Amino acid sequence: MATLNPLSWVTWLAENEDKLRPPVNNYCLYQGNDFILMAVGGPNERNDYHVNETEVRLQWHQPSETNEQEWFYQVQGDMLLRVIENDTFRDIPIKEGEMFLLPGNTPHNPVRYKDTIGLVMERQRPAESRDRLRWYCTKGNHCSPTIIREEVFHCADLGSQLKPIIERWQQDEESRRCGECGCIADPK
């Protein structure tokens, strides 16, 4: 059996601050069989919306609810969680010391400000699950959120897998052109 010891959060932050850098600012603290716990710093440099599809329907509560949520806890400073809810953009402020449980399969964009730190907990992804990074047009006069680009992948390591996808988006202007209105989205 492995020896279990508590983690000194203050010491860990002092020794690992460099791991919480753009564009993702994410470091995996724990990866078990059931869940992943990540430390996330700010500021981040991304405008994508992440969709985690590891969905399992519950028999209790309401039949349409899922148990594959993402848990956010804001340790230091405030953040903003942009989501798409009922086919509409919505901003959810999460203040220092607050927690938020995001329903599964909700497109979300965590906006982290300078000198902020949070914890995020997610379920492990089954081999058949697919994550998505989506970019939406925010410049055209669209009636509902309009996807410009979507990358689909199996996520085994969020911290390392998101960075090259985000960097491709930022570097390729033509991939940021909206197919409906022709506007070019900002890289960040």
From Swiss-Prot:
UniProt: Fe cation binding residues: H50, E70, H108
GO cellular component: cytoplasm
Reaction catalysis annotation: 3-hydroxyanthranilate + O2 = (2Z,4Z)-2-amino-3-carboxymuconate 6-semialdehyde
Leading EC class: oxidoreductase
Pfam families assigned: 3-HAO
GO MF terms, alphabetically ordered: 3-hydroxyanthranilate 3,4-dioxygenase activity; ferrous iron binding
Main location: cytoplasm
Record keyword Secreted present: no
Binding site for O2: R46
CDD domains, per the entry: cupin_HAO
Cofactor: Fe(2+)
Pathway annotation from the record: Cofactor biosynthesis; NAD(+) biosynthesis; quinolinate from L-kynurenine: step 3/3
GO biological process: 'de novo' NAD biosynthetic process from L-tryptophan; anthranilate metabolic process; L-tryptophan catabolic process; quinolinate biosynthetic process; quinolinate metabolic process
Entry keyword Metal-binding: yes
EC number, UniProt record: 1.13.11.6
InterPro entries with a match to the protein in the record: 3hydroanth_dOase, RmlC-like_jellyroll, RmlC_Cupin_sf
Compartments it resides in: Cytoplasm
Binding site for substrate: E70, R112, E122
UniProt keyword annotations, A-Z: Cytoplasm, Dioxygenase, Iron, Metal-binding, Oxidoreductase, Pyridine nucleotide biosynthesis
Function: Catalyzes the oxidative ring opening of 3-hydroxyanthranilate to 2-amino-3-carboxymuconate semialdehyde, which spontaneously cyclizes to quinolinate.
Family affiliation: Belongs to the 3-HAO family.
Name of the protein: 3-hydroxyanthranilate 3,4-dioxygenase 2
Organism in which the protein naturally occurs: Aspergillus fumigatus (strain ATCC MYA-4609 / CBS 101355 / FGSC A1100 / Af293) (Neosartorya fumigata)
Name of encoding gene: bna1-2
